[in-house]
A protein has these predicted regions:
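Rossmann-like AdoMet
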Residues: 1-56, 73-105, 130
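Short C-terminal domain-edge/linker segments immediately following a structured domain
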Residues: 47-51, 115-121, 165
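S-adenosylmethionine-dependent methyltransferases
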Residues: 54-55, 112, 153
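Short beta-strand immediately N-terminal to the catalytic nucleophile in serine-hydrolase-like folds
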Residues: 59
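Conserved glycine-centered beta->alpha loop in an early N-terminal alpha/beta scaffold
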Residues: 62
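Glycine-rich SAM-binding Motif I of class I
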Residues: 65-70
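S-adenosyl-L-methionine
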Residues: 97-146
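Active-site segment flanking the S-adenosylmethionine/decSAM binding pocket
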Residues: 131-171
Length: 171
């Protein structure tokens, strides 16, 4: 149990989040995991600035329940952009808990759900719009699995707070 005990709780936007006993902190604020993903990650990403034929390269550090990437994927639904996606996560339980929750599943398009399910089952997804790989383990070591020359258009860094998890906030 890498993140300690995980307690599930509802948030005000109808999504759910988890509280980690190890870090004594919730994954999301009580206003809503889905709202937080859209406000802190998807909107600031300004994906419309990329040309339609551009392959979007994304790194999601501390993938957790998957809200941030799933919200991004849904925001791109129907666009011509392709994606190369990498995720890093230390604990398999958050994604499994998310995929066991009907409310969580109902937030997403069919293609986004398929990506999440594929990440849970085989740590990667491939579809007509791109491909993705999720590396399980400590993000600091998992970065070595990504080619050194790889650059990213977007990096989602969603670790616990620097006070609770300073190892993922060092320079």
């Amino acid at each position: 149990q890498v993140l300690g005990e995980l307690d599930q709780f509802p948030t005000l936007d109808g999504s759910f989040s988890l509280h980690s006993s190890l870090f004594c902190e919730a994954f999301h604020n009580s206003a809503g995991a889905l709202n937080e993903a859209r406000a802190k990650f998807v909107r600031p990403a300004e994906v419309q600035r990329f040309k339609p034929d551009h392959t979007l390269r994304v790194l999601d550090v501390c993938f957790g329940l998957g809200y941030n990437s799933a919200a991004l994927w849904d925001s791109l639904s129907g666009q011509t952009s392709r994606m190369q996606w990498w995720g890093l996560e230390i604990d398999t339980r958050p994604l499994r808990l998310a995929l066991a929750d009907t409310g969580f599943i109902n937030h997403w398009t069919h293609s986004t759900f398929n990506r999440l399910r594929s990440l849970d089952q085989c740590s990667e997804w491939t579809d007509a719009d791109g491909q993705g790989t999720l590396f399980w383990g400590d993000a600091r070591q998992c970065l070595d699995n990504i080619p050194e020359e790889q650059s990213f258009d977007l990096i989602f860094h969603d670790a616990f707070s620097p006070q609770r998890c300073p190892q993922l906030w060092s320079e």
